[in-house]
Amino acid sequence: AKSTIDFIEAHCFDTDGRMYFEVTADGRPLRKRRYVFSESFAAIAMAEYAKASGDMTYAEKALNLFKDIRRFIATPGCLEPKYLDTLQAKGHSIVMILINTASRIREVISDPVLDQQIDESLESLKDFVKPEFKALLEMVGPNGEFIDTINGRVINPGHCIETAWFMLEEAKHRGWDKEITERALQILDWSWQWGWDEQYGGIINFRDCRGLPPQDYSQDMKFWWPQTEAIIATLYAYEA
């Protein structure tokens, strides 16, 4: 783990503080993407290493990187938008992963920004929940508007179940907060109904909230991560 952390610090950060998405075996940069998921996972790794090793300098590094992530997201023009100005939208995935990132870092270091981020994400998630479809959507307008296009109708059951997992974990942290628990269980139930393959079992990758054919080539496949997310989320649901 330490050798991997050392490699990340030595080779995986660009001069602007953002991370590369892919580097060569000897650390030369290959690709840099518009997301901050690499940074989020690196922050989690540093927090977990701090916990495992007892070296709290990595807790500080995790927190500083988390603050950088928030700055990257908040700074206009820092991250390349997914769409041109014709479409104004926001995505579910970054809102969701920041809950997990903040909660992992919170286990090794205290800072008000961590709870602040979790509260902000929990509030923002309400924009993606659409009771009329019994679904949590992957993309909505800036104020939660439904975007009735092939991309705006996407349901990613694994992502939604992962969100339920993170929400239930946070609810437990707050002494099983009733409102968060109920919201999470609703998302889990809806997402299970959308994602579960009644014939063969397992969670499939993508659905369309109007029941139309999804665009993604892997829409009817069952990658391994939605299955693991479903296992963890349902264990939390059982505990709740």
Language model feature labels by segment:
Residues A1-A240:
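Glycan-recognition and catalytic cores of secretory/periplasmic carbohydrate-active enzymes
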